[in-house]
Amino acid sequence: MGDVRDRPVRDRWGMTDQPFRFSSRSSRRALALLGGCALLGAVSTPAAAQSPGHGRWVGTWAAGVTAVPDRAPGYPDGRIAYVEDQTVRQVVHTSVGGDALTLRLSNEHGDEALRLGAVHVAARAGAGGTDIDPATDRTVTFGGNRAVTLAAGTRIVSDPVALDVAPDADLVISLYLPGRTEVSTVHQYALQVNAVADGDVTGARTVTPVAAPEQWMFLSGVSVRARTRTSAVVALGDSLSDGVTTTAGANHRWPDLLSDRLRAGRSPDLGVANVGIAGNRLLHDPNPPAGQPVEAYAAYFGPSALHRFERDVLGQPGAEHVIVLLGANDLGQPGSSAPVAETVTAGQLIQGHRRLIARAHARGLKIYGGTVTPLKGAQFGFWSEEIEAKRQAVNRWIRTSGAYDAVIDFDAAVRDPAQPLRLRPDYDGGDHIHLNDAGAQAMAMAVPLRLLR
């Protein structure tokens, strides 16, 4: 049976994560521009339920969840503030297959209990939309019950669901919320059009959307019971891992493309859990200057990687490897979307990396350091000669210290050979910091597959 207990969200030091609350919100584009590169958070249910049967439970899909900024007049950006007597239908993409699955649901940032009247999962029908294949539709239970209530600040893992799950495929997860429910726990950049429909239509082949949010709501992971002995690699990062300027609906984030490489090579059964969060920092939680527009969306940046490492990395079922790509937001946000007082030194960033390494090694995980990619020309004050000197110092330490189990030189993979402080123009997503699909492919190709075998 699945672990169905509501679990308080506590970090390594026993502190309960509190919901971030800010005064207003802004557009997806503004958040993307400030997203930089980062990811990770608090403690999650350690492993999917080990039900009777063969194989091992491993994460096939994941998302780092965050709080939602307070809604304020003047920011009609399409976010769904509340749902009531409605079904939220969401599409996720698998990395590895299996013969059963569990869902991880989250009310970590909610101020009130989250009541789910019904939950269904099915294979997606067709290449677009949220239609399901009725032959694959399954009711999801929690301790044998179809309805479940999550207390504020908790998360839950479902009972195992018997369903043949294919790798590199889309699942549709439908949540029915009978009462008025604030949408409080999300992943902002789904890069996937989901659906909200009236009534309990969790088992319907097709729904009629009243809204089409591009977020994942109350959903943080899917695990499968793999048919073979396998494991998972976790991508811990910021907006570069979150793929904010890659093609929506195409699954072209670099961790997605790494999963494609693994399936085509000698590691077809390795799960990839992408817990990148746009705007995430290694050292600091969101802390926008009061009265600034960034208050509208900074909550989406998520708890610092140090604070969410337990939840998002060590808590991933089957995790044996972690790739870290963080630091750009620590360098670039102070003075724009974070207080000047949070300006960091290269030494402080290095100490943060050492803490991640120690925690991974204490749990037997291999951890690989990704170099910080070029920032020159980036918007919102992300580059100066001082910031560049710090970036070079951190990258030099990552490359030469031997502290990480291996180095993945993302910087070398995407920089312009003619102007190495800048991104290659053909990899530039348009703002001189984020990457397009070709740039994401270059990052995926920079990962030596031998590390993950």
Briefly describe each language-model feature range:
Residues 27-33:
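N-terminal export leaders
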Residues 11-15, 19, 33-236, 242-250, ...:
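N-terminal secretory targeting modules
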Residues 1-26:
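N-terminal secretory signal peptides that target proteins for export/translocation
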Residues 106, 176, 236-239, 274-280, ...:
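Active-site-proximal beta-strand/loop segments in catalytic clefts of secreted hydrolases
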Residues 61, 84-90, 113, 119-128, ...:
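Conserved SGNH/GDSL esterase-like catalytic core that processes O-acyl groups on lipids
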Residues 353-361:
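Surface-exposed amphipathic alpha-helices with a cationic face
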